[in-house]
A protein has these predicted regions:
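N-terminal helix-turn-helix
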Residues: 2-84
Length: 84
């Protein structure tokens, strides 16, 4: 594996870990949180939080009531959990 491929792979792993961290924060706050609140709790830049939330929302893993939240766990999480 080339150095470039390793960098891409480790970056992919990092974003998965960050996404999982966001999901855990939302699990602890069922009423939902804004992007800013999520960023404060996980120590990530708002732009990073926004990018990850958008991807998670596209997959149904998080849901929001507006452009900036509040965000909460989405319906796909429930569907996935029922198969465990």
């Amino acid at each position: 594996m080339s150095a470039e491929e390793q960098d891409t792979r480790s970056g992919g792993i990092q974003v998965i870990a960050r996404a999982a961290e966001l999901l855990r924060v939302l699990q602890a706050h069922p009423g939902g949180l804004s992007q800013a609140e999520i960023g404060e709790r996980v120590g990530m830049a708002r732009s990073t939080v926004s990018r990850i939330l958008n991807a998670l929302e596209d997959e149904g893993l998080v849901a929001s009531r507006g452009a900036r939240g509040p965000y909460r766990l989405g319906p796909e999480i429930t569907r996935m959990a029922t198969t465990v």
